[in-house]
């Protein structure tokens, strides 16, 4: 899909070439529109962004959904975390759940992606199934957690958040 002027201005957050440091300019690229360009390297510089995973963690025995509270905030959200350089997103799902909750994922299902502009991050949402919560032990990133039946999870997740949109889309597809 071609870039529009507004999108180019957003992409021009990256003002300098990541290889040589030269100031980027806007340049037309056939089939793409206006794209950031390094005149020294003579290369187009497509936008760089973070990649993260967000998980709807489901207990296979009870059907409950795990929601967490983090960083002193008062609302429940989904377990999430950044994908490491060179890491597959599917691996990041299991790693983040293991790091934050101690639980081992038995299987995952990809749901959808959404770009989260405030942190310049492509969020990849998955459903992650755990056999039970006997391994559950949170790390320092999690203040508290709670298992919810699906409808209760929907009522308790942070309103107007990307986590809520992911959970609602998952729940709506389950109907």
Give residue ranges: language-model regions.
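Conserved N-terminal beta-strand and adjoining loop/helix that marks the start
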Residues: 22, 33-35, 39-65, 82
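A broadly conserved sequence feature marking short terminus-proximal activation segments
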Residues: 1-14, 166-174
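Conserved Nudix-box catalytic region and its N-terminal flanking loop in Nudix hydrolases
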Residues: 6-7, 56-99
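Short glycine/serine/proline-enriched coil/turn segments at secondary-structure junctions
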Residues: 47, 75, 117-120
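Short, intrinsically disordered, charge-biased short linear motifs at domain edges
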Residues: 1-8, 17-29
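Conserved hydrophobic/aromatic beta-strand scaffold that supports enzyme active sites
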Residues: 16, 56, 67, 125-127, ...
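Unchanged
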Residues: 83-107, 112-169, 174
């Amino acid at each position: 899909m071609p870039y529009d002027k507004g999108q180019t201005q957003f992409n021009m957050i990256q003002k300098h070439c990541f290889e040589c440091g030269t100031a980027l300019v806007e340049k037309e690229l056939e089939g793409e529109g206006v794209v950031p360009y390094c005149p020294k390297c003579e290369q187009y510089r497509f936008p760089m962004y973070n990649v993260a995973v967000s998980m709807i963690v489901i207990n296979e025995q009870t059907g409950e959904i795990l929601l967490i509270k983090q960083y002193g905030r008062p609302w429940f959200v989904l377990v999430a975390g950044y994908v490491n350089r060179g890491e597959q997103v599917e691996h990041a799902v299991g790693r983040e759940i293991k790091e934050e909750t101690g639980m081992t994922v038995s299987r995952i299902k990809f749901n959808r992606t959404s770009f989260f502009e405030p942190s310049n991050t492509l969020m990849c949402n998955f459903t992650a199934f755990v056999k039970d919560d006997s391994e559950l032990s949170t790390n320092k990133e999690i203040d508290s957690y709670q298992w919810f039946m699906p409808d209760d999870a929907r009522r308790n997740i942070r309103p107007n958040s990307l986590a809520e949109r992911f959970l609602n889309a998952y729940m709506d597809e389950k109907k």
